[in-house]
């Protein structure tokens, strides 16, 4: 059977100080990500490319206009969805934007979190445990994009591999 995942984008918006990234603390009832910090993003619509999707999602979720972004990688998440749906995501860093970030959006509060906290420094943040694997690659100094796969079964990551 052909692999036909839901395609999405995930963006990590850098604060102008370069030390923090914008995250949403998902607090909407019934949300698969409820109680966890996550980057911003969403599903690709059938009339857009992935950069257009990133720009649209960040305008909708954070009220910002992206002016510079970098593709950091792509990840296949077989079985990740609430009903076991497969996801395939393009992961970006947003280096520059215009606009003022609100305190919250429909999904929950928006917070500028220190990147070192996202990478595991200090008190652990409530996040998907699997995110800690790929966030190291998102924020490292290697300019090459990564290409990973992280299978999920019943909401738990069962593996992680990547190539550059």
Regions found by a protein language model. Give the residues of each.
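Short connector loops at helix/strand junctions that flank enzyme active sites
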Residues: 6, 34, 39, 66, ...
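Short, active-site-adjacent segments that bind or coordinate small-molecule cofactors and metal centers
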Residues: 132-161
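Conserved Nudix-box catalytic region and its N-terminal flanking loop in Nudix hydrolases
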Residues: 20-60, 153, 158-164
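Conserved N-terminal beta-strand and adjoining loop/helix that marks the start
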Residues: 1-22, 43
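Unchanged
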Residues: 44-67, 77-130, 137, 160-164
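A generic fold-level signal
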Residues: 4-6, 16, 31-32, 84-86, ...
């Amino acid at each position: 059977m052909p692999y036909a995942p839901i395609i999405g984008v995930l963006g990590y918006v850098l604060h102008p100080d370069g030390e923090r990234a914008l995250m949403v603390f998902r607090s909407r009832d019934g949300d698969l990500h409820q109680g966890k910090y996550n980057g911003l993003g969403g599903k690709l619509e059938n009339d857009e490319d992935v950069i257009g999707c990133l720009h649209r999602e960040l305008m909708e979720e954070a009220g910002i206009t992206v002016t510079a972004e970098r593709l950091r990688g792509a990840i296949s998440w077989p079985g990740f969805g609430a009903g076991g749906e497969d996801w395939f995501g393009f992961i970006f860093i947003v280096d520059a934007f215009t606009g003022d970030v609100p305190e919250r959006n429909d999904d929950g509060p928006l917070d500028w979190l220190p990147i070192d906290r996202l990478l595991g420094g200090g008190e652990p943040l409530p996040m998907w445990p699997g995110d800690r694997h790929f966030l190291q690659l998102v924020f490292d100094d290697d300019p090459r994009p990564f290409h990973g796969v992280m299978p999920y079964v019943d909401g738990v990551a069962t593996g992680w591999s990547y190539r550059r």
